[in-house]
Every structure is written in C-alpha cells, then in structure tokens.
C-alpha cells in the first residue's frame, strides 16, 4: 500500500505579483493567492484525499494557504505542525528586489543561477540589516548560528532534511497521509531529495503556486509516482511563468 504526500506551494503572494524576491520576508497572499489556495483544496477534495496531518512554515503566505485549502477540504480540524525549517530559501541581499530590474543589472544568466542553481548563494545580507532573522521574535528560541543570511538550494535542503527525517517521514511510515504547505524552494529541495534529481536537472524544475503535487511513496518512501492535480497543461503553463520571472524585458 502506497503512502500519499502532497506538496503545495503557497498561493500568489503580494511580492509574487510584484515580481520581487521574497525569501524570509513575511509577505501575505493576494486575493488571487487566496483563490488559488481554495482551488487547491477543491482539487484535493475531488481527488478524495483525506489527510491525517499537515505541516507548514512560519511564514504567513504558507500558513494562510494551508488554512484556505483545509477549509475547502472541510478538514480544518487537522493537526498542523509549523517549523522554520520549511521556510522559503533565504535570498540574502536580493530580498525585496525586483527580479526584472535585477536581471537588467546583473544579466539574466546570473539571476537564473542565483534563483535556480543548486549550490550557489546570492550575496548575503549584513548582520546589521533590520531584516536579519535574529531580530524577528518568531526565531528567538533558535541559536543565531543556524539563522541564514543567504542560502543556496543545497543549504535549503540541508535545513529541510532534518525536519523531514524527524517529523514527516515517521508519519508517512505510520501510514499517515501528509500535506505540506510551503514555498517554491523548500519544496524544490524536497522534490530533489524524493526524486533523487541531479544538481543539473533541478535547475529546470519550477513549482507553480497553488497547484497540489501528489506523490505516492512505497513502504520505504521511494517515489512510485507523482503528478500535479487538475489540468496538467495548466500546471505546465504556471511552471513556465515561474521560470520566466527572472528574465529582463
């Protein structure tokens, strides 16, 4: 019997709509983002998914997406676990910058490397930057040494994996059906891990907002199959839109 896991990237955020790098900045959803989250819930309901537990990050765009989706699923009562380890990749000094302006300044190739490569970090924020996570009380209990000032996708995977191993994998091994509402890069990290994707191929993997990605896993948590729910062509178009965000006009 296969285990079921759904990865759900949050709906469109206010900075997604403005084409800005977001990272750990706590930006809310647009109205379209709420609608995407609700539609995701309907798609999961149509699939007949009955979850046992849900996980999300400490950022409200993922939290609110989960809330909207669970309401549409009529599964608001589910236990929800939140962890900083599911936060978006920290984009360092790029956070808040317009992606098109950044591509015009540094070149599309460089921006694409910063956005989609596996092991290259963007420039870091300074320790005295007001947006440094150590100044955010939601991270007050964490050792400052673990708080990032920039991250590559590799760093993000190294951050996410302990939570996968300690919290999520044991639930799947207990035959629970699990929903994760998180972010483009924390989910790309899990996608890479689950599919054993190469460092080169992950460059071209783009996860669209608000479309559930259903994995069926074996009893050893190996991938049996995975697919986006709903219209596959719509998911492909949405992924292409994500890929084009870092291109100069």
Curated annotation (Swiss-Prot):
Residues under site feature: Transition state stabilizer: 183
Entry keyword Isomerase: yes
Disulfide bonds: none
Keyword Magnesium (UniProt): no
Enzyme class at the top of the EC tree: isomerase
Any GO molecular function: phosphoglycerate mutase activity
Reaction(s) this enzyme catalyzes, per UniProt: (2R)-2-phosphoglycerate = (2R)-3-phosphoglycerate
Alphabetically ordered keywords of this record: Gluconeogenesis, Glycolysis, Isomerase
Active site (catalytic residues): 10 (tele-phosphohistidine intermediate), 88 (proton donor/acceptor)
Biological processes per GO annotation: gluconeogenesis; glycolytic process
UniProt xrefs under SMART domains: PGAM
Gene3D superfamilies the record matches: Phosphoglycerate mutase-like (3.40.50.1240)
E.C. designation(s): 5.4.2.11
Record Pfam families: His_Phos_1 (PF00300)
Pathway in which this enzyme or protein is active: Carbohydrate degradation; glycolysis; pyruvate from D-glyceraldehyde 3-phosphate: step 3/5
Binding site for substrate: 9-16, 22-23, 61, 88-91, 99, 115-116, 184-185
Domain of life: Bacteria
Function field: Catalyzes the interconversion of 2-phosphoglycerate and 3-phosphoglycerate.
NCBIfam families reported in the protein's UniProt record: pgm_1, PRK14115.1
Known partners and oligomeric status: Homodimer.
Family according to the record: Belongs to the phosphoglycerate mutase family. BPG-dependent PGAM subfamily.
Protein name (Swiss-Prot/TrEMBL): 2,3-bisphosphoglycerate-dependent phosphoglycerate mutase
The species this protein was found in: Xylella fastidiosa (strain M12)
């Amino acid at each position: 019997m296969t285990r079921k896991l759904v990865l759900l990237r949050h709906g469109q955020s206010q900075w997604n709509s403005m084409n800005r790098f977001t990272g750990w900045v706590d930006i809310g959803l647009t109205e379209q983002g709420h609608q995407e989250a609700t539609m995701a819930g309907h798609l999961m309901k149509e699939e007949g998914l009955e979850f046992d537990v849900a996980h999300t990050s400490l950022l409200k765009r993922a939290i609110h997406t989960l809330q909207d989706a669970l309401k549409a699923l009529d599964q608001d009562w589910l236990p929800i676990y939140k962890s900083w380890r599911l936060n978006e990749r920290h984009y360092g000094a790029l956070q808040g910058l317009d992606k098109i302006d950044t591509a015009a300044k540094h070149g599309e190739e460089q921006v694409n490397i910063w956005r989609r490569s596996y092991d290259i970090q963007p420039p870091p924020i300074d320790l005295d930057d007001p947006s440094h996570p150590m100044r955010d009380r939601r991270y007050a209990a964490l050792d400052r040494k673990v708080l990032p000032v920039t991250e590559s996708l590799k760093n993000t995977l190294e951050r996410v994996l302990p939570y996968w191993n300690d919290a999520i994998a044991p639930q799947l091994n207990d035959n629970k059906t699990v929903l994760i509402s998180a972010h483009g890069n924390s989910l790309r990290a899990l996608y890479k891990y689950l599919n054993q994707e190469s460092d080169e191929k992950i460059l071209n993997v783009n996860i669209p907002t608000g479309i559930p990605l259903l994995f069926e896993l074996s009893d050893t948590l190996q991938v049996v199959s995975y697919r986006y729910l709903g219209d596959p062509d719509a998911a492909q178009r949405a992924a292409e839109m994500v890929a084009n965000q870092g291109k100069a006009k």
